[in-house]
Amino acid sequence: MAAGPVTQAVPLALRQATAALDLVQNNPRDAERRALAVLRRSTTQPEARVVALWALGRAQFEQDAPGDARDTLTEAARLAGSHRLANHAAQIRVSLSMCLMATGATSRALRQLALAERALTGVAQARAITQRGLLFARLGRLEDALGEFDRAEQTLRDAEHTRDEHERDDLGLARLLNNRGPLLVMLGHLARAEVDLREAGELAERLGQRLLVARTLHNRAFLETRRGDLPKALRLYDAATRDYQSIGDVEAIAPTLGTDRCELLLAGGLIGEAADAAAQAVAVSVRSGNVLAVAEARLLLARAHLTAGEFGAASAQAIEAAGAFKRTGRSSWVALANYVAIQADIVAIQDSRRPPRRLIGQATTIARQLADHGWRVEALHVNTFIGRMAIALGRLDIAEAALATAGDARHRGTADLRVSAWHATALLRFVAGDRPGAKRALLSGLSVLDEHRALLGATELRAHAASHGAELARLGLRLALDEGRPRDILVWAERTRAAALHLPPVRPPDDDELADLLARWRQASQDAREATLDGDDPAGGRHRAQLLEGQIRAKARLAWGAKAAADAACDVAALARRLGDRVLVEYVEFEGELSAVVLSAGRATFRRVGSMTDIANEIDFVRFNHQRLALTVGRGGSAGLAAQRFLDTAALLDHRLVTPLRLPAGRGVIVVPTGVLHAVPWNALSGLHDRDLTISPSAALWCRTRGRLTPPEAERRPADDPRTPGASHDRVALVAGPDLDGGRDEVAALRDVYGRRTRELVDADASVDAVLTACETSDLMHLAAHGDFRADSPMFSSLRLADGLLTVYDLERLRSVPTTMVLPACDAATTDVRAGDELLGTASALLTLGVRSVIAPVAKIPDRATTPLVLAIHVGLRRGLPPSTALARAKAEARARGGPADLAAASALLCIGADDRASTTSGA
């Protein structure tokens, strides 16, 4: 009788072990717990123990512990062999192969698979073949991997039609499709990859395999990243992450999520975040002992360093990754790492007139290796580099061969690939002496970039997209400068300048959720500030705010873009007509030299200005002395000394930037800066005194915005015309944030300027929601508040209101905006300048949303000292003057008063935008 219970326990243990094995793909943590429970029983018979060890090993591998999994599965295979469980032993070897691969034992992994395949038949053998395909993919043997997947699929498809459930393997088919999908992406077969991944997801859903469902979403996100649809990729990554979190530790069950997100961040130009993600992925992989993942993460980190211009760090990480790949027999990945290393070497000397000859030979070898291993996109990029270097060395034969190969992908693949191919084609035509053909190729490449940018809804992603077309614009500008035609130089200088501002604004998705995140961030930031003021530790509030910033950025990036690209081209004839008697100055930087195109009375002239390095130093001196002036206002003699130093340095900068232009006297001027020139306090330069001065991010944008008016009718309106801004029917909002010296008095004085029809928000009434509502219901807004420009994260640049900080993200939620905004808030006009003179900051965000003119400071300003200047500006606006004219007259009055405070305020304020006096409210 004693044997009865034991006899019954044997099949129960086997059933429990089998259940644990079946659970691995769905919930590896629970599968591990169940397998351990079976193994703890001394009565467990050999087959049940083998299956439990198999389940435990697979669960360990799924939770990113490949070393532990290898040891467990090795013991399982040994035990199965000793008890003559041949089928179990063979299938365990299939699982063991991936653990061996992950821990660097590539040859052993392939031997285990060979042994397994010989011992298996039917769908079990197909699983072994699938596993070999996955191993080949990890080795970089992409075509071999595809062949194995296709061979295994045939067996699994045949079994799919049988009525015998034991002969079918729908889960095996789903896993095959999910593994083949990313391989097809790497081979450039995006449509076929999408079919695989969608079918894999449907099968996984039907089978109730939650972990596999998450992985199909993860791989679809990878596909959309390569396709260039970043908002869709972000949404899919978010969905996959939520599914992973519902199952267990994301870091353990999805160790590649970090590296794949890093690739997305790189594609979006978010370099700092990408580098952080790659560094974290390296650390996670080192902890887990997954040598393959470590090497791949190092390669991504190298790419992040390369994109950031940190060439030494990029080369070091790439070389280290190449060594790791070589040690594990991954020759294809060695080529990929060498590709990144040589990119760092080439880009580091790209401005050199004569690059070292050795680089061409090295690059040619790497391009051939990349092509042989199936890395087509990377081979194209290297061939483009080879062509450029060969042109510099006069080896046109080498250049033509390399560029012809690189140009083959003009009409297929991702946006980045097509842009690179058009660049190669332009270079090839340039070498052949076909300059018109080269320009057509450049314009085609930039059109691809415009279409790609239009897909993006988030301002941040749109601004970063210009980096993909930097080389195209550089070559186009070079051709124009060589030919010396000022109008062509202006057109090419404009072609990528602040192009993101030409697109219609996109309201971020999930508005209620984003609003909640912003409110919580405001509270956390406020808590940190109050703790600091009270002498307490602000670390808790800062940490919460930092976490919320990441969530806000992620949510805002989900916005869908427009259906069609905006036309960013500059029509010089239309621009000349709309300028009237004004003068346009567009600054252009090329190879370290600053020049300018001056457009006046329909005639364009080209002026050389000087060394960009010297000018940048002068700008730093001017800004430093302006800040010192602002801080010393009210301190008697020290303020006077600071004012004189500021005037002296401003005179030097005026001599460098304005004197060479030889501007006609008395004309209004529109200045289009570039690079560091966006930080210039232009109204401090004497050559621009006594002029209506407008700053615009782009001549084409200024022209297009002015074109939406009805000149010359708008120009002829008298000050008392009811359609003129400031007339009695206009909706005017007056806002003064907290802790402003004289803020309440300033609003009271402005009420007298505009009369009773004003909405006033002062002190506690000036909350974020109240100010946003006022923005949506006003034609003109005056918003005085303490401002803060966030160089580390420009979208969090802010204005301090009664209940916290108003950010660029808040502004982007507006449905309509005023025509004109006056923002006497420190640094409100300061911007972060990205590739292509794309701008991120408070004032640039307002222009994107439809505000036509912004008057704001590009530096610090003293609070109460600005009141006389601001009042004078509003008096001019009330009389119907254009914003630039109102500011110019107010500046003249301030200079006449002659005090240091007047000088500090008048020098910092700028009129930015289209200088538009139209009174209709702009829809965002």
Where are these regions (language model features)?
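Residue register of alpha-helical TPR repeats
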Residues: 13-14, 51, 91, 127, ...
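Single-residue signature of alpha-solenoid repeat helices
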Residues: 31, 69, 109, 145, ...
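Caspase-like cysteine protease fold
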Residues: 789, 794-817, 863-924
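Amphipathic alpha-helical segments of tetratricopeptide repeats
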Residues: 36-40, 75-84, 114-121, 150-161, ...
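Residue signature of alpha-solenoid helical repeat architecture, marking inter-repeat boundaries
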Residues: 10, 47, 87, 123, ...
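Amphipathic alpha-helical protein-protein interaction segments
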Residues: 2-5, 419-420, 435-690, 715-719, ...
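A domain-level signal for caspase-like cysteine endopeptidase catalytic cores
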Residues: 197, 675-677, 708-788, 823, ...
